[in-house]
Each structure stands twice: as C-alpha cells, then as structure tokens.
UniProtKB/Swiss-Prot annotation:
Entry protein name: Large ribosomal subunit protein uL3
Organism annotation: Geobacillus thermodenitrificans (strain NG80-2)
GO molecular function: rRNA binding; structural constituent of ribosome
GO CC term (a single one): cytosolic large ribosomal subunit
Protein origin, superkingdom: Bacteria
GO BP field: translation
Subunit structure: Part of the 50S ribosomal subunit. Forms a cluster with proteins L14 and L19.
Family, as annotated: Belongs to the universal ribosomal protein uL3 family.
Transmembrane feature ranges: none
UniProt keywords, alphabetically: Ribonucleoprotein, Ribosomal protein, RNA-binding, rRNA-binding
Disulphide bonds in the chain: none
Gene responsible for this protein: rplC
InterPro entries: Ribosomal_uL3, Ribosomal_uL3_bac/org-type, Ribosomal_uL3_CS, Transl_B-barrel_sf
Role, per record: One of the primary rRNA binding proteins, it binds directly near the 3'-end of the 23S rRNA, where it nucleates assembly of the 50S subunit.
C-alpha cells in the first residue's frame, strides 16, 4: 500500500556510502503530519488519507479550515494534500504521520512545483536547435516555421515561446539514503523538483522495480 508524507525541501548536500562513494542527496524536512480525514470507497468512491502540514495561525484561517481541523483535534494547516492508495485502516483521524514510516533504501516518488523560469524562447523551453550564427544567416533563435499553409492556422502542439516552469513535476524511483526521525529529515538520492523551502510530497514509488 502507498505511504506518503508532506515536507519542505531544505537544499542539497552530499554523504559518503560505506564503500566510500560520494552520494549527492536532497534534504527534506517533514515535520509530523496530521491525518485530517479518511476517504473511503463507500463515502467517496476511492481510498485516501488527507494529510495536513504546518500549522496555520487562526487569524489567517477561515471558519471552514478551523472547523475541518477541529474534527481532528488539531490546529488549521497551511498545506493539505491527499495520499491515494493508502491503507485507511492503518490510520486514525488526528494521528501523526512521521518520517519513520519510511526506512533507508526505500524507493519513492517526489512531487513538487518546479522553479519558475519566466518567459523563455523555444531553445531553452523546448530544446530546439538554433540556426547558424554567421555567414549571412537570418535565422538564429527564432521558433522557425509555424506549419503548413493549408490548415490556415497554427496547431496547438506547436512549440512556441512562453512561460516556463512553475508546473507540478514528479520525479520517480528515487532512493532514500537516510532517515533521521529526531530531526524529521529525509535524505533522498539525487535532486527533487522545486526551490529551497518549496513544498514536496514524498510517496511510495508507483513503478518501483521488484528486487
């Protein structure tokens, strides 16, 4: 069954394996989450647990947020996300979920919002090749042909300049190198989406290869 927790990306560092290999890792701080609600097939048509992360001041929370959190005997939460596919029988409303649900060597998927890059051209945004930069070329970094004349329009799938980044991105099959329950930290091999202090969701890998 799926396990998951919400956290914040702290940054990157490196650790040494027992054989001396240098491993780049991303540090994720996941303070205890609270189960706010359990979704069941009978009531909702699917199974999931709803987790809350980071307390929100009651001055900044509205009445629905305060009332929803009160059912779990907790403070309103800044971030609320669902973990689908979790075994709801293992959780109770108001229960805390900590980093120790994962262990060293687990394979996980990490979801976050990618860094915003602003308005970018087709070379940076889509990896398009540029034209010659010399010898009288008048084509350098432009998008190029918009398509054939016959349709009298530009197709929706045409790669064009525009806003880049700021999208929900999931990186799959990342390995947990270390779990630190005392400091609520997860060390995950490689990089994860988003800037420092960005919200991330760490879940059991969907496509993890069987050992």
């Amino acid at each position: 069954m799926t396990k998951g927790i919400l956290g914040r990306k702290i940054g990157m560092t490196q650790v040494f394996a027992e054989n001396g290999d240098l491993i780049p890792v991303t540090v994720i701080e996941a303070t205890p989450n609270v189960v706010l609600q359990k979704k069941t097939i009978e009531n909702d048509g699917y199974e999931a647990i709803q987790l809350g992360f980071e307390d929100l001041s009651t001055k900044r929370a509205n009445k629905p947020q305060i009332g929803h959190a009160a059912k779990a005997n907790t403070a309103p939460k800044r971030f609320i996300r669902e973990i689908r596919g979790a075994n709801v029988n293992e959780y109770e409303v108001g229960q805390e979920v900590k980093v120790d649900i994962f262990s060293e060597g687990d394979i996980v998927d990490v979801t976050g919002i990618s860094k915003g890059k602003g308005f970018q051209g087709v070379i940076k945004r889509h990896g398009q090749s540029r034209g010659p930069m010399a010898h009288g070329s008048r084509y350098h970094r432009r998008p190029g042909s918009m398509g054939a004349i016959a349709p009298n329009r530009v197709f929706k799938t045409k790669n064009l300049p525009g806003r880049m980044g700021g999208e929900r991105v999931t990186i799959q099959n990342l390995k947990i190198v270390k779990v630190d329950p005392e400091r609520n930290l997860l060390l995950i091999k490689g990089n994860v989406p988003g800037p420092r202090k960005g919200l991330v969701i760490v879940k059991s890998a969907v496509k993890a290869k069987a050992k």
